[in-house]
């Protein structure tokens, strides 16, 4: 029994209703069974975050795949969750405390963590609720959090097993210190940005008074921690100085001149200062030469007690003062303006300070090797394939991973220290006393683990590991990971090596990479530019289906996507087009019960639309299997808008309105095509398709569990497609000719179709009704004819078309209108010629502007030619 649709589509009302229905009926939930599994783990968004366009794209793509596989009969689990986001979340709560005039230290660790958990409870559900408005068909009953009990147990277990294997160690090392976030961050959390700076040339006096050694540096404030000057062993200029001492300016400490191949002879003077405590390369040089490590900056990037009289100065103030003092001493040779790469914290954009500190590290080489092998042997595949090379290059050059963070919010490192004997005690349980000396004076490491450490375990920790649960056995390895190209190193690579280490299998078989969502000008969306678009607002104004469809049709794997409001409006127009066509179909299906399609009763249009439906089923299925989601969506858009709505629905009207026989057959075909098309479109636009599908005769409780459409052999009909294509070409050309001279749509007249081809003649005569209905013209088919006077001429599909104008338009008025158009065009040609002949314009205007104006001029000349031809033809007739 069909039920008609309201005249206007209201997305908000429809979306709320159906999401509630799906969730309450448990359609998203699944348990292991005998079916083939399909599993996706959601990249966990920050628990305190808000839905942004990147999330909207990422989760739309995952939802399309989940809904598609569910309809194909797979046991489909899309596992959702959120990330505790150490630095970001702690910063949010500290910001709140600052408003109250407090710091985290005022509260103490325990009370501060209570505040963070309270913040998480207040704001943690915001993003998951926003994902619901997008239509995400996740199994919310299985929602996880990286700090929940199960994930915390997994994190502790992984840390301790790696520690026991010797793959986690603690050592002094140069790390990336963020003075604003007050923590170490890993190499890949550092953004290297090109910045203007200066290269300072400084004279270091030789200890024997025989002269100077000139070094070049961009960071004179760190010279207070220099413990050597290095030159290349093959640099003839300095060979005799190797082994001698220079006096460190401002500190007056003798330091050696050493030879090391690390030095670039061509950079600066070929002599470089070595500061092992404040530069990663210098640190390595220092280890090779057993140099002391002098730290001169504290946690706030302020000069410390080793900086002498500069103690207490901010690093940039110290730089300024040191340069002034060097000038006064006559030791500053020169300053050179340069552009160089400067590391910034990816969270807060503060300039990173390389700094010596004791941290926890994961030894990466043994873990990277299996992850490299997995990509080389095809155990894991990247889509597009070009990202395999990017992934491998990073793993080939990987450094040990610094995993400790100087934060309170996160997974605390499961290691205790004995205050009496210094014993290091890794433990799964809380340590009360030292196993070595039995002292009860023990304390836990204050640091927490890098957020990405727990995220790296996501594909197996969320399925119950370290317990060997039914879910873990059934759903692991997961099927595909959908994620942005910006976190291949942060997350994808780490999940791969952790999965291989602890599960002995890759965590996912394929990685589908998408790009970033940029603004219309191709810029990253950011608060500072004020160019962000809020998906929640877009859903409120245009509906979730329109946003989803716009995002996916503008997307190709691995490439960035530009957000255009015009395309969003286009997606909404598409939803309205589908709604209106469906409303028409439903109005004509009242009291209809499907009986099945009888081939012998089908018209050419029926046979054509069913054959085209078959092709669309095959193409959409193939595109989805290849992760070409944008191509699949475009295929559906063109079929629904152009072929179904604009052609087939229009061609059924004479039959439905009783002007021709075959109304029942038209209803059967309309029903079959609309229902199947809705099922194909459902993964992309879940809400509107459910709303319409539920009003059609159907089996089952929801479209999301309807079987995925399959092509039918009896729908195949290449001949019908070929014939219909010819008929459509002829109709389009007649329409074009009528539009050229502004024939009113209601004005009907004769059109002469000239062809000697018997098959074409039969096709045109049998479908004269279609030409009359869609081209508002009465066709007369003849084998040959001279060009009639006062007729427009066209050619389509091997048919010559004559459109006599005499009875269609007022020839005098049309000539007058065309002359006015010609006058405007001539004025534009004159204006553009003057502009393009102006030397001032050509000299000042950008090349693309000049080219655009030239293109306009060419187009106007073409228009002038067409108008003159039409005026000539009308003048001849008059």
Curated annotation (Swiss-Prot):
Monomer. ValRS has two distinct active sites: one for aminoacylation and one for editing. The misactivated threonine is translocated from the active site to the editing site. The C-terminal coiled-coil domain is crucial for aminoacylation activity. The keyword Isomerase does not apply. Gene3D superfamilies: HUPs, Isoleucyl-tRNA Synthetase, Domain 1, Valyl-tRNA synthetase, C-terminal domain, Valyl/Leucyl/Isoleucyl-tRNA synthetase, editing domain. Keywords: Aminoacyl-tRNA synthetase, ATP-binding, Coiled coil, Cytoplasm, Ligase, Nucleotide-binding, Protein biosynthesis. One of its GO terms (molecular function) is ATP binding. A motif ('KMSKS' region) lies at residues 524-528. ATP binds at residue 527. Residues 804-871 form a coiled coil. PROSITE patterns: AA_TRNA_LIGASE_I (PS00178). GO terms for cellular component: cytosol. It comes from the Bacteria. InterPro entries: aa-tRNA-synth_I_CS, aa-tRNA-synth_Ia, Anticodon_Ia_Val, M/V/L/I-tRNA-synth_anticd-bd, Rossmann-like_a/b/a_fold, tRNA-bd_arm, tRNAsynth_Ia_anticodon-bd, Val-tRNA_synth_C_sf. Its EC number is 6.1.1.9. The keyword Coiled coil applies. Pfam families: Anticodon_1, tRNA-synt_1, Val_tRNA-synt_C. GO terms for biological process: valyl-tRNA aminoacylation. This is Valine--tRNA ligase. It catalyses: tRNA(Val) + L-valine + ATP = L-valyl-tRNA(Val) + AMP + diphosphate. A motif ('HIGH' region) lies at residues 45-55. It is found in: Cytoplasm. Belongs to the class-I aminoacyl-tRNA synthetase family. ValS type 1 subfamily. Catalyzes the attachment of valine to tRNA(Val). As ValRS can inadvertently accommodate and process structurally similar amino acids such as threonine, to avoid such errors, it has a 'posttransfer' editing activity that hydrolyzes mischarged Thr-tRNA(Val) in a tRNA-dependent manner.
């Amino acid at each position: 029994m069909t039920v008609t649709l309201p005249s206007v589509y209201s997305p908000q009302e429809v979306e709320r209703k159906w999401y509630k229905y799906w969730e309450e009926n448990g359609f998203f939930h699944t348990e292991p069974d005998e079916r083939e599994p399909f599993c996706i783990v959601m990249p966990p968004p920050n628990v305190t975050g808000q839905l942004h366009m990147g999330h909207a794209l990422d989760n739309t793509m995952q939802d399309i795949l989940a809904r598609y596989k569910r309809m194909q009969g797979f046991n489909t689990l899309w596992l959702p969750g959120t990330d505790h986001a150490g630095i970001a979340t702690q910063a949010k709560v500290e910001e709140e405390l600052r408003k109250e005039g407090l710091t985290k230290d005022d509260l103490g660790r325990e009370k501060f963590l209570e505040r963070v958990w309270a913040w998480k409870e207040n704001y943690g559900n915001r993003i998951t609720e926003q994902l619901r408005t997008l239509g995400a068909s996740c199994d919310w009953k299985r929602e996880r959090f990286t700090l929940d009990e199960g994930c915390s147990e997994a994190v502790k277990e992984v840390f301790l097993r790696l520690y026991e294997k010797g793959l986690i160690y603690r050592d002094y090392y140069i790390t990336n210190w963020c003075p604003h976030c007050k923590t170490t961050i890993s190499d890949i959390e550092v953004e290297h940005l090109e910045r203007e700076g200066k290269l300072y040339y400084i004279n270091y006096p030789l200890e024997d008074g025989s002269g100077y050694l000139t070094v070049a540096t961009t960071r004179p404030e760190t010279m207070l921690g220099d413990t050597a000057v290095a030159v290349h062993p093959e640099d003839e200029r300095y060979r005799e100085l190797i082994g001698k001492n220079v006096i460190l300016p401002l500190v007056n400490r003798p330091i050696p001149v050493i030879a090391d191949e690390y030095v670039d002879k061509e950079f600066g003077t070929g002599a470089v200062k070595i500061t092992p405590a404040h530069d990663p390369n210098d640190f390595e040089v220092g280890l090779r030469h057993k140099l002391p490590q002098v730290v001169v900056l504290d946690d706030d990037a302020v000069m410390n007690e080793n900086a002498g009289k500069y103690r207490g100065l901010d690093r940039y103030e110290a730089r300024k003062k040191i340069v002034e003092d060097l000038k006064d001493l006559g030791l500053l040779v020169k300053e050179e303006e340069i552009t160089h790469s400067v590391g910034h914290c990816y969270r807060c954009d503060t300039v990173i300070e390389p700094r010596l500190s004791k941290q926890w590290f994961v030894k990466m080489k043994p873990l990277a090797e299996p992850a490299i092998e997995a990509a080389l042997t095809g155990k894991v595949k990247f889509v597009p394939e070009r990202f395999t090379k990017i992934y491998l290059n990073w793993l080939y050059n990987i450094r040990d991973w610094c995993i400790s963070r100087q934060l309170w919010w996160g997974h605390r490192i499961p290691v205790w220290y004995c205050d009496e004997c210094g014993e290091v005690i890794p433990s799964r349980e809380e340590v009360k006393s030292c196993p070595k000396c039995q002292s009860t004076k023990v304390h836990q490491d204050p640091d927490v683990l890098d957020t990405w450490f727990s995220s790296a375990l996501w594909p197996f920790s969320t399925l119950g590991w370290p317990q060997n649960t039914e879910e873990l056995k059934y759903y692991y390895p997961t099927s595909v990971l959908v994620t942005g190209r910006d976190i291949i190193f942060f997350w994808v690579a780490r999940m791969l090596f952790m999965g291989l280490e602890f599960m002995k299998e890759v965590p996912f078989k394929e990685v589908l990479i998408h790009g970033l969502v940029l603004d219309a000008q191709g810029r990253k969306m950011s608060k500072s530019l004020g160019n962000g678009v809020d998906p929640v607002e877009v859903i409120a104004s245009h509906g979730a289906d329109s946003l989803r469809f716009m995002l996916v049709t503008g997307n190709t794997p691995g490439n960035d996507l530009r957000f255009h409001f015009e395309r969003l409006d286009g997606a909404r127009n598409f939803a309205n087009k589908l709604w209106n066509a469906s409303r028409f179909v439903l109005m004509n299906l009242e009291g209809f019960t499907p009986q099945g399609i009888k081939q012998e009763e089908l018209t050419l249009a029926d046979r054509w639309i069913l054959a085209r439906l078959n092709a669309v089923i095959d193409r959409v299925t193939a595109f989805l299997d290849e992760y070409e989601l944008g191509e699949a969506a475009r295929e559906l858009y063109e079929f629904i808008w152009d072929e179904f709505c604009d052609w087939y629905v229009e061609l059924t009207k004479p039959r439905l309105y009783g002007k021709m026989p075959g109304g029942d057959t038209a209803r059967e075909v309309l029903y079959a095509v609309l229902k199947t098309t809705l099922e194909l479109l459902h993964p992309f636009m879940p809400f509107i398709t459910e709303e319409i599908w539920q009003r059609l005769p159907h089996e089952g409780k929801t479209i999301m569990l309807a079987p995925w459409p399959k092509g039918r052999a009896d729908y195949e009909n290449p001949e019908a497609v070929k014939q219909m294509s010819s008929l459509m070409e002829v109709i389009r050309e007649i329409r074009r000719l009528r539009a050229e001279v502004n024939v009113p749509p209601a004005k009907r007249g004769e059109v002469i179709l000239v062809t000697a081809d018997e098959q074409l003649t039969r096709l045109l005569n049998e479908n004269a009704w279609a030409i009359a209905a869609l081209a508002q013209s009465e066709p007369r088919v003849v084998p040959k004819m001279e060009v009639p006077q006062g007729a427009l001429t066209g050619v389509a599909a091997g048919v010559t078309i004559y459109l006599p104008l005499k009875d269609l338009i007022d020839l005098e008025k049309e000539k007058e209108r065309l002359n006015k158009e010609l006058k405007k065009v001539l004025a534009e040609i004159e204006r553009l010629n003057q502009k393009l002949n102006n030397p001032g314009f050509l000299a000042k205007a950008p090349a693309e502007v000049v080219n655009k104006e030239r293109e306009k001029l060419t187009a106007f000349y073409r228009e002038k030619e067409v108008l003159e031809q039409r005026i000539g033809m009308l003048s001849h007739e008059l």
